[in-house]
């Protein structure tokens, strides 16, 4: 993995400002100050229902397309994690008074849905290395967001920890760095240009920011003064 480690380090360095905008997003501060109305939490759950449902199909697609590569075991684990997340999300939805039928008719927000649309694009047109590289950069960021959100929901909204398993799955996700690095290296060895790994990570991280911007907008949280 001699090529991959410095490549990922450069990507992370290049995306530091974007990472800071996500981790310091005003939406999290609003949650921690109980300024997000409980009804707006339903928006988060409704959007995640569409995202996770889409990502399940996308991971199944990349597994179908490139399932003869060594990366198949990685994608099987990711697929199982997404399935568990969808079940946990439905438990959270029930706590907020939402039925599965409510989630299925919840209208996707374009800015919130961009993330899973790009994951689907990578699964259809990209490589396992591009998607693994994008996840390698993005999922730790998403996990940190989930950690901050579960703490706020438990402390400020009195939501029982037992119903916050959706956030636990991502916030406490075991490290998959070595597996993802190996997949990226395998892609480079097959001739994949480094710029495509960088592009996939940059785009997905940008769509992550768009998701939180959409959540802030839906909750009437000003995006300036992020903290």
Q: Where do the model's predicted regions map?
A:
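Accessory, usually C-terminal, subdomains that scaffold auxiliary metal cofactors
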Residues: 179-191
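Alpha-helical bundle segments that constitute or directly flank the non-heme di-iron/ferroxidase center
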Residues: 16-23, 31-65, 125, 130-147, ...
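Short, charged, low-complexity loops and linkers
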Residues: 1-7, 30-42, 97, 125-129, ...
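Charged/polar positions within long, soluble alpha-helices
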Residues: 53, 57-60, 87, 91-94, ...
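Acidic, low-complexity proline/glycine-rich segments
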Residues: 1-27, 106, 110, 175-179
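Active-site-proximal alpha-helical scaffolds that flank and shape metal-associated catalytic sites
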Residues: 70-172
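Surface-exposed peri-terminal alpha-helical interaction modules
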Residues: 72, 160, 178-181, 224
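Acidic, carboxylate-rich catalytic segments that either coordinate divalent cations
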Residues: 194-227
